[in-house]
Each structure stands twice: as structure tokens, then as C-alpha cells.
């Protein structure tokens, strides 16, 4: 029984990982190969993919699978499996606190903002980037309020990189 649930978890996490790989490839292409003028379309692609990823990462079936694995015979599993379950559950809990709309808007703005930043830097017109930065900070504050409403926005965001 445990083996079946763990295999389901691995299958779901592999699919998420593959989609994250596609996201990384789109980002790499944007930085290296993408032709000028394609930024708007790429931002929409990244937003759509971010939405699909979010749906998979917040799928109730994934949550059910994680809860079953966490509650039943955790001692019977190896350290690697327990760590995978712990990290997947941590990600699941975090992602379920954030609405899909916000995930997509952050992804789209980040992609679109990159092109604006590149042009602003080339032309030494950093004020052109200010509205993007202002909106991005506003969205990150909203994200922080979703995941940790009782914390400062900085603390909620830094916890992604420096836990604790």
C-alpha cells in the first residue's frame, strides 16, 4: 500500500519536474535566443505554463497522497523517501495558499519585465523599468500575505531561500 502511494507521488513529482524543465528552457531561450518582439508572446506562454504547474502542484489528489504517506508507516520508509515526502508536503502547503491568478501574474510580469529591463539598461533609462519593479514588489507583498499573513513580507519571501 505504501509503495503504491509513494509511486504515485514520484510520478506526480516527476511530471511537475518535467514541466519546470520546460519553464527553465523557455527562460533560457528568452535570455539567449528569442528574437526581439517575441517578449509579449513569451510572457503569455510562461504565464500559461505557470498556471498549469500551479494546478498540478495544488492538485487535491497530490495532497491526499502526501497525507496518506505522512500518516501511515512513515517509520517503514527510508530517509530519502521521508525527506521527499516532507519537502513535497512543504511545497504543497505553500502553493495551496497562493491563488493561481497571482502565480500567473507574477510569472508573466517577471518575463515581460526582463525585456523591459534589458532595454532600459541598454538605453540607460532605468525609469522605464520603475513601473514593472513597483508592480512586482506589490505582487510579492500580496504573495507574502497569502503564505504568511502574520509575517513581514521580507521574512515570507526570504524563507524560500533561507529557511527559518
Predicted regions located by residue number:
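A well-structured
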Residues: 1-163
Amino acid at each position: 500500500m505504501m509503495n503504491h502511494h509513494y509511486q504515485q507521488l514520484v510520478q506526480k513529482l516527476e511530471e511537475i519536474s518535467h514541466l519546470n524543465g520546460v519553464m527553465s528552457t523557455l527562460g533560457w531561450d528568452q535570455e539567449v535566443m528569442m528574437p526581439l518582439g517575441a517578449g509579449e508572446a513569451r510572457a503569455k506562454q510562461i504565464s500559461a505554463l505557470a498556471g498549469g504547474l500551479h494546478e498540478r502542484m495544488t492538485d487535491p489528489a497530490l495532497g491526499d497522497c502526501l497525507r496518506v504517506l505522512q500518516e501511515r508507516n512513515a517509520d517503514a520508509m527510508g530517509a530519502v523517501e521521508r525527506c521527499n515526502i516532507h519537502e513535497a508536503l512543504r511545497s504543497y502547503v505553500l502553493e495551496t495558499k497562493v491563488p493561481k491568478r497571482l502565480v500567473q501574474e507574477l510569472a508573466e510580469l517577471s518575463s515581460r519585465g526582463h525585456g523591459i529591463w534589458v532595454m532600459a539598461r541598454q538605453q540607460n533609462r532605468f525609469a522605464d523599468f520603475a513601473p514593472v519593479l513597483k508592480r512586482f514588489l506589490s505582487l510579492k507583498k500580496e504573495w507574502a500575505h497569502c503564505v504568511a499573513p502574520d509575517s513581514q513580507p521580507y521574512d515570507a519571501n526570504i524563507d524560500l531561500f533561507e529557511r527559518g
